[in-house]
Regions:
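Conserved Rossmann-like nucleotide-binding pocket used by diverse enzymes
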Residues: 3, 59, 131
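Short acidic-hydrophobic surface loop/beta-edge motif
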Residues: 5, 17, 119-125
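Active-site HxH/HxHxD metal-binding segment of metal-dependent hydrolases
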Residues: 32-124, 210-213
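Conserved S/T- and glycine-rich ATP-binding loop of Class I adenylate-forming
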Residues: 17, 61, 135
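Conserved beta-strand hairpin/beta-sheet module of binuclear metal-dependent hydrolase folds
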Residues: 1-46, 144-156
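Metallo-beta-lactamase
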Residues: 23, 32-35, 49-51, 97-98, ...
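Short Gly/Pro-enriched turn/cap motifs at secondary-structure boundaries
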Residues: 5-7, 113-114, 134-136
């Protein structure tokens, strides 16, 4: 199953991917900035069906500050590295600078332990597979996570409901984003759910038919 939370003033979607058989889970984009948001996330993980889940991975779709507002406290709480693509590591070091502009009270996170992932790598959360697909264009290091057993893809800020991520920030590139979305995301089956970094969910078939950026 996939549990969604929406955190901080940028309304970022944080996802918890749960393997219900093994009670293992992965946290994707821990955006919980406020202490009450931390508590919501920790309470879900630690009281799931009256038992505690084992967090095995803390994943980032990308390292823009709104998506990592809770990264340090989550990594420290579960004593795990952050799992991400190498091309986005510099954004951890720039978190404080970006945060001061965007209203986030975060420090630089370049000291956090990083477990690097590559395009097409398969992660296992218990018996649940997560396929890592590198989809740059919104920013360096941007990943989409495909979950075949859930018929879903977590797209971060690459793909939204009938829209796409902005490409005017450092490292963004519009042609690259369009090409990667068409070749790496829209090739998934039409019935796959699209779980974006902001806003409501969609479906691959609907994005292929109605997303004007991708027609």
């Amino acid at each position: 199953m996939i549990k969604q939370f929406t955190f901080n003033h940028f309304e970022v979607n944080t996802y918890v991917v749960v393997d219900e058989q093994t009670k293992q889970c992965a946290i994707v984009d821990p955006a919980c900035e406020a202490s009450f948001e931390d508590s919501q996330l920790f309470e879900f993980v630690e009281t799931f069906h009256e038992t505690s889940l084992q967090v095995t991975h803390i994943l980032l779709t990308h390292a823009h500050v709104d998506h990592i507002a809770g990264l340090r406290q989550v990594c420290e709480h579960y004593k795990l590295p952050v799992t991400m693509h190498a091309e986005g590591r510099h954004l951890l070091r720039q978190a404080e600078a970006y945060g001061s502009v965007m209203g986030f009270a975060v420090d630089n996170m370049g000291d956090l332990e990083v477990a690097e992932i590559e395009d097409n790598q398969i992660l296992h959360i218990g018996d649940t597979e997560i396929e890592c697909r590198y989809v740059p264009g919104h920013c360096p290091g941007s990943m989409c996570y495909v979950l075949p057993q859930e018929k879903a893809v977590i797209t971060g800020d690459a793909l939204f409901h009938f829209s796409i991520g902005r490409t005017d920030l450092p490292g963004g590139d519009y042609p690259t984003l369009i090409e990667k979305l068409k070749s790496r995301v829209l090739t998934l089956p039409d019935d796959y759910r699209v779980l974006p970094g902001h806003g409501i969910a969609s479906q691959i078939g609907k994005e292929k038919k109605y997303n004007s950026f991708l027609l």
